[in-house]
């Protein structure tokens, strides 16, 4: 099972973590998350994954509260959406998170 994992620094206080596993060319497991550094700690802000056997998006506020959104997508499409969404919207998500809102 080929595995791919990397971390991309988006700014001094923002990074994207990407992990996925393929089997016979299909995504069988993935996590893509936006992390923001606050008070010298990295905190997850947005996490796309397939835990619980379905693709979903977890949105966190600065207090650690979570909202879960079912994506109703296969893992390949969810992984593409996750990468694109974080690449395009991380600055907006960071701003909302630091204000105390859900991104």
Residue ranges and their predicted role:
Residues 29-67:
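A short, structured beta-strand/loop element
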Residues 8, 55, 80-82:
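Exposed, low-complexity/repetitive linear segments and helix-based recognition motifs
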Residues 62-103:
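Acidic, low-complexity intrinsically disordered segments
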Residues 7-11, 25, 59, 63, ...:
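Residue-level signal for well-ordered alpha-helical segments
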Residues 1-39:
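Negatively charged, low-complexity tracts enriched in Asp/Glu with abundant Ser/Thr
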Residues 3-5, 23, 35, 44, ...:
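Glutamate identity and glutamate-enriched acidic tracts
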């Amino acid at each position: 099972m080929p595995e791919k994992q990397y971390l991309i620094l988006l700014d001094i206080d923002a990074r994207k973590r990407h992990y996925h596993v393929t089997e016979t060319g299909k995504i069988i497991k993935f996590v893509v998350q936006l992390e923001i550094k606050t008070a010298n700690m990295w905190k997850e802000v947005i996490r796309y994954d397939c835990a619980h056997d379905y693709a979903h998006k977890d949105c966190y506020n600065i207090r650690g509260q979570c909202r879960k959104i079912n994506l109703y997508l296969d893992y390949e499409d969810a992984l593409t959406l996750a990468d694109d969404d974080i690449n395009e919207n991380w600055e907006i998500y960071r701003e909302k998170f630091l204000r105390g809102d859900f991104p």
